[in-house]
Amino acid sequence: MRTVAAALLLALSLTPALAQDAKIGRQKAQACMVCHGQNGLSTQPDAPNLAGQPAMYISNALKAYRSGDRRHEMMAMMAQTLSDDDIQNVAAWFSSIRIEAHLPR
């Protein structure tokens, strides 16, 4: 029982940090929004929507662009400007955006 209580306390203590990371990420993601949209929904036909994507997916993609393991000229240049903390914060921001899907009838 103590283990469960300790885990719950730890999880609750991390929540404000995650919210703050997303807030910082939103500020850092201003350049991203030119192509990926203010709300994470792309304004460019060749740029994917980032709203609601898992943070790990976004983080891994940015790190791969930065290292050259994944190739795209613009994304490589953008990722080069981001620190590891920046990448985590940007990923937290885009993953925190909630989207709603409507299925066709």
Regions inferred by a protein language model and the residue ranges of each:
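C-terminal capping alpha-helices of c-type cytochrome domains
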Residues: 56, 70, 80-105
